[in-house]
C-alpha cells in the first residue's frame, strides 16, 4: 500500500525541512549530546557491575536496557519543552552480545537472565531524536576477567586476542576512515590521489565501499550484511528499512551478494574462464529519486550521514564461506537444537499505511499513545507504561505488572499489522561448499516475505541462483560467529561557510577497548587510511571535526534499580 502525499508536501518534508540552519543544527547537537550521555551511562553501568564489582550481582541485559532508556527519557524531559512537538528515543537501548546483530532489548519481565561472561564482546546501540532529527550510535566493548591493581587502579589483566579482536579493530578503523572520507566532500581538493585516480574531486559511494572492503580484507574480516553508510533526513533515519521504501535513498549497503561478487571476481582473476557478472552500478553519478540503493552517488555538503559498520572475522574457519543473518524468535530451535538461543522481539514500529478498526479498548488506547508519543520511530512496550521512566526498584516492579496488562492490546495491534516487530538477528557462517552442493529446483525467485529487505536486495545470491528462502533453509548447517559494530552520525556542515564535520555521536567518547590483532592494514590501504586520518588531526590545513560531548551526569543510584 502506498501513502498519497502531495508533491508540495513531499518537497517540504524531504527538501525544505532538511536544509541546514542554526535551528536544525542545534536540534541535531542536543540529540547528539543526549545520545552520547546515554552511551556513557550504559558503559559506566557495565564497568561498575562487571569490572569494578560495585554491585552485588551483575546487571542483566533487561536491567541495562530499561535503565538506559530511562536515563535518555529523563534527559529529553529537560530540553525543548515548548519549542517543538516531537522528541524522543529514535532507537531503544539494545545490548547485542557476541553474534547478535541488533534489536535485542529484552523487556524487564523476561524470565531469562541474560548476563555476560569474560571474553564476551557487547555492542550498545541507542538513538535520540529532537523534532525528527536523529542521532544514533553503536559501540562495542569487551567484558574482561577480574582485573589487576596497578598504581592503585584496577586494570584488565591483558588485551583481548583472537578473531573478536580482529573484528573490533576492523570496525573501528573502517568507521573512523569513512567519517574522514565523508568530510572530504567539504574540501574535495584535498582528496588523496589513491582514492581518486581520475581526479574527479568527488566523494562517491564506490570509494566508500572500496576502502571499507580493503580494511575488512586486511584484518581477514567480512562486512556483515546490513552494514551501511547512508544519508539520513528528518524522520528518515533508517528505522523502517524493509517496511517503507524510502524515496531518494542515498547510501552504500552491504549484502550477501557483495560477498558473492568479491569471490567471483577473485576467481576470474585466477582463471581463464571468465564468469559474466551482473553490473548493478549505474552508468553515471546520479542523485535520482530511486529507492534502490546504488553506489553511484556523490556525497554533498550540508548532508547528514549515519555510518553503521559491522565486521566479523572468519579466522576461525578454514574453508571459504558466506556470512549471513538469521532471524531469531521464540520458536527458533524448538524442533532441532535444544540449547539454541531463542527470544521474543520487543522493539516495534508503527506502519501508517495500515488502518483497522480495533475491537479491544486496551488496543485502541495503546494505539493512540503510540501515534501520539512515538510516531514513526521504534518503541518498546515498556515505554508506554505510566511508570516509565523508572527511577528505582519499586518502579521496575510496577513496570512489570503494567506490561502484563498492555500485552493483550499489543497482540491485536501486531495481528492486524498496525505495528511491525523489528527482528532480532544473529550472524551465521555457511561454508560455500554447502551452498554449491545444495539443490535449488525453484531457482532464485522464492522470496522470504517475512524478512525485511531493501528494494533490489530481495535475492541474496543472484549469480548462484540462491533465493532467500533457500538460504534460510541452509542455516541449519551454519555456525554462529561473533561480530563487532560501530555506528556514528555526522553532519557535513557548510552553513555560514563553516566547512566542518560535526560528529554527533562516537569519536573520542567511544574509544575502542583494549584489544590486540595479529593483522594490520596492507600497505596500499594503510597509505590511504593514514592520509585521511591525518587530515582529521590537522585543524589548520586538514578537515575540521567537532565532536558533541556528553552532558555531566548527576549523582544517580543505579544500584537501587536492580531487581532481586
Swiss-Prot record:
Keywords: Cytoplasm, Hydrolase, Metal-binding, Metalloprotease, Nucleus, Protease
UniProt cross-references to SUPFAM superfamilies, sorted A to Z: Creatinase/aminopeptidase, Winged helix' DNA-binding domain
EC annotation from Swiss-Prot or TrEMBL: 3.-.-.-
Claim: Ribosomal protein is one of the keywords in the record: no
Keyword Glycosyltransferase: no
Single GO MF descriptor: metallopeptidase activity
Top-rank lineage group of the source organism: Eukaryota
Annotated family: Belongs to the peptidase M24 family.
The protein's role, per its UniProt record: Probable metalloprotease involved in proper assembly of pre-ribosomal particles during the biogenesis of the 60S ribosomal subunit. Accompanies the pre-60S particles to the cytoplasm.
Protein name, as recorded: Probable metalloprotease ARX1
Amino acid at each position: 500500500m502506498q501513502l498519497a502525499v502531495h508533491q508540495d508536501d513531499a518537497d517540504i518534508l524531504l527538501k525544505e525541512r532538511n536544509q541546514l540552519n542554526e535551528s536544525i543544527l542545534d536540534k541535531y547537537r542536543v540529540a547528539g549530546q543526549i545520545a552520547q550521555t546515554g552511551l556513557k551511562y550504559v558503559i559506566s553501568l557495565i564497568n561498575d557491575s562487571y569490572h569494578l564489582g560495585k554491585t552485588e550481582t551483575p546487571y542483566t541485559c533487561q536491567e541495562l536496557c530499561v535503565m538506559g532508556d530511562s536515563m535518555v527519557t529523563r534527559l529529553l524531559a529537560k530540553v525543548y519543552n515548548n519549542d517543538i512537538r516531537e522528541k524522543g528515543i529514535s532507537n531503544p537501548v539494545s545490548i547485542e552480545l557476541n553474534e547478535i546483530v541488533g534489536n535485542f532489548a529484552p523487556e524487564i519481565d523476561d524470565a531469562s537472565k541474560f548476563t555476560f561472561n569474560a571474553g564476551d564482546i557487547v555492542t550498545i546501540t541507542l538513538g535520540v531524536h529532537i523534532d525528527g532529527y536523529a542521532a544514533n550510535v553503536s559501540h562495542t566493548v569487551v567484558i574482561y576477567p577480574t582485573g589487576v591493581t596497578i598504581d592503585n587502579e584496577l586494570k584488565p589483566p591483558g588485551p583481548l586476542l583472537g578473531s573478536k579482536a580482529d573484528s573490533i579493530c576492523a570496525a573501528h578503523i573502517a568507521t573512523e576512515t569513512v567519517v574522514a572520507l565523508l568530510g572530504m566532500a567539504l574540501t574535495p581538493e584535498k582528496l588523496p590521489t589513491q582514492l581518486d585516480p581520475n581526479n574527479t574531486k568527488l566523494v562517491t559511494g564506490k570509494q566508500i565501499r572500496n576502502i571499507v572492503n580493503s580494511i575488512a580484507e586486511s584484518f581477514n574480516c567480512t562486512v556483515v550484511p546490513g552494514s551501511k553508510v547512508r544519508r539520513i533526513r528528518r524522520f528518515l533515519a533508517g528505522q523502517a528499512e524493509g517496511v517503507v521504501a524510502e524515496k531518494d535513498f542515498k547510501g552504500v549497503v552491504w549484502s550477501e551478494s557483495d560477498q558473492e561478487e568479491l569471490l567471483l571476481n577473485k576467481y576470474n582473476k585466477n582463471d581463464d574462464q571468465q564468469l559474466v557478472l551482473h553490473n548493478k552500478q549505474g552508468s553515471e553519478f546520479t542523485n535520482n529519486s530511486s529507492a534502490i540503493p546504488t553506489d553511484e552517488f556523490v556525497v554533498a555538503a550540508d548532508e547528514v550521514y549515519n555510518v553503521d559498520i559491522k565486521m566479523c572475522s572468519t579466522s576461525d574457519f578454514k574453508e571459504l564461506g558466506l556470512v549471513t543473518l538469521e532471524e531469531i524468535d521464540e520458536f527458533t530451535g524448538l524442533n532441532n537444537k535444544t540449547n539454541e538461543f531463542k527470544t521474543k522481539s520487543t522493539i516495534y514500529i508503527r506502519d501508517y499505511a495500515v488502518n483497522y478498526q480495533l475491537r479491544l479498548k486496551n488496543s485502541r488506547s495503546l494505539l493512540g499513545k503510540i501515534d501520539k508519543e512515538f510516531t514513526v520511530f521504534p518503541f518498546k512496550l515498556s515505554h508506554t507504561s505510566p511508570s516509565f521512566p523508572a527511577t528505582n526498584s519499586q518502579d521496575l516492579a510496577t513496570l512489570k505488572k503494567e506490561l502484563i496488562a498492555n500485552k493483550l492490546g499489543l497482540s491485536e495491534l501486531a495481528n492486524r499489522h498496525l505495528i511491525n516487530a523489528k527482528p532480532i538477528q544473529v550472524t551465521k557462517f555457511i561454508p560455500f561448499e554447502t551452498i554449491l552442493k545444495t539443490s535449488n529446483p525453484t531457482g532464485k525467485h522464492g522470496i522470504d516475505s517475512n524478512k525485511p529487505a531493501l528494494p533490489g536486495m530481495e535475492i541474496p545470491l543472484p549469480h548462484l541462483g540462491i533465493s532467500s528462502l533457500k538460504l534460510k533453509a541452509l542455516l541449519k548447517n551454519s555456525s554462529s560467529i561473533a561480530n563487532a559494530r560501530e555506528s556514528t552520525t555526522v553532519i557535513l556542515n557548510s552553513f555560514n561557510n563553516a566547512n566542518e564535520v560535526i560528529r554527533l555521536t562516537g569519536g573520542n567518547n567511544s574509544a575502542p577497548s583494549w584489544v590486540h590483532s595479529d593483522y594490520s592494514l596492507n600497505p596500499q590501504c594503510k597509505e590511504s587510511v593514514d592520509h585521511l586520518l591525518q587530515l582529521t588531526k590537522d585543524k589548520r590545513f586538514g578537515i575540521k571535526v567537532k565532536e558533541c560531548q556528553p552532558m555531566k551526569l548527576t549523582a544517580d543510584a543505579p544500584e537501587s534499580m536492580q531487581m532481586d
